[in-house]
């Protein structure tokens, strides 16, 4: 059985359940296109946190992820998968984006398994959550657009194979327009 469910619809439409909206992004502090741009318009405080993280850590974020509160909806967390140093036409190569996607999802998996912890001895995923998390991370539904396939130009089927590697550990709802 697949760990990926496809639905048609608008991923930004408010839902009545706890969810983590996952997107791939750059480490340069720019939510300038694709779903990231839509997130920036809708959740400017979350974008401010994202920019702060990027300014502090830069490319050291590659292969990591961070959870940000949306500040608008207490059931919505935003998960940034850091898969490329830069965005736009300066994005990384396809294989490195896929490798960093897998590493970042591994981090998310670790924190989901850690129940209500957002810090381990090696990493922190939720420095910005400060009371904005309602449930243990593992109870949030994981949702995403077809990550990497827009501005980063990675064929969706290749990212889909990375997601399938997490079968049994994480299930994803993928939104299609």
Curated annotation (Swiss-Prot):
<dbReference type="Pfam" id="PF01661">
    <property type="entry name" value="Macro"/>
</dbReference>
<feature type="binding site">
    <location>
        <begin position="31"/>
        <end position="36"/>
    </location>
    <ligand>
        <name>substrate</name>
    </ligand>
</feature>
<protein>
    <recommendedName>
        <fullName>ADP-ribose 1''-phosphate phosphatase</fullName>
        <ecNumber>3.1.3.84</ecNumber>
        <ecNumber>3.2.2.-</ecNumber>
    </recommendedName>
</protein>
<dbReference type="GO" id="GO:0016791">
    <property type="term" value="F:phosphatase activity"/>
</dbReference>
<keyword id="KW-0378">Hydrolase</keyword>
<dbReference type="GO" id="GO:0042278">
    <property type="term" value="P:purine nucleoside metabolic process"/>
</dbReference>
<dbReference type="GO" id="GO:0047407">
    <property type="term" value="F:ADP-ribosyl-[dinitrogen reductase] hydrolase activity"/>
</dbReference>
<comment type="similarity">
    <text>Belongs to the POA1 family.</text>
</comment>
<dbReference type="GO" id="GO:0006388">
    <property type="term" value="P:tRNA splicing, via endonucleolytic cleavage and ligation"/>
</dbReference>
<feature type="domain" description="Macro">
    <location>
        <begin position="1"/>
        <end position="177"/>
    </location>
</feature>
<dbReference type="InterPro" id="IPR050892">
    <property type="entry name" value="ADP-ribose_metab_enzymes"/>
</dbReference>
<feature type="binding site">
    <location>
        <begin position="9"/>
        <end position="11"/>
    </location>
    <ligand>
        <name>substrate</name>
    </ligand>
</feature>
<feature type="binding site">
    <location>
        <begin position="147"/>
        <end position="153"/>
    </location>
    <ligand>
        <name>substrate</name>
    </ligand>
</feature>
<feature type="binding site">
    <location>
        <begin position="24"/>
        <end position="26"/>
    </location>
    <ligand>
        <name>substrate</name>
    </ligand>
</feature>
<comment type="function">
    <text>Highly specific phosphatase involved in the metabolism of ADP-ribose 1''-phosphate (Appr1p) which is produced as a consequence of tRNA splicing. Removes ADP-ribose from glutamate residues in proteins bearing a single ADP-ribose moiety. Inactive towards proteins bearing poly-ADP-ribose.</text>
</comment>
<dbReference type="GO" id="GO:0005654">
    <property type="term" value="C:nucleoplasm"/>
</dbReference>
<dbReference type="GO" id="GO:0006974">
    <property type="term" value="P:DNA damage response"/>
</dbReference>
<dbReference type="InterPro" id="IPR043472">
    <property type="entry name" value="Macro_dom-like"/>
</dbReference>
<dbReference type="InterPro" id="IPR002589">
    <property type="entry name" value="Macro_dom"/>
</dbReference>
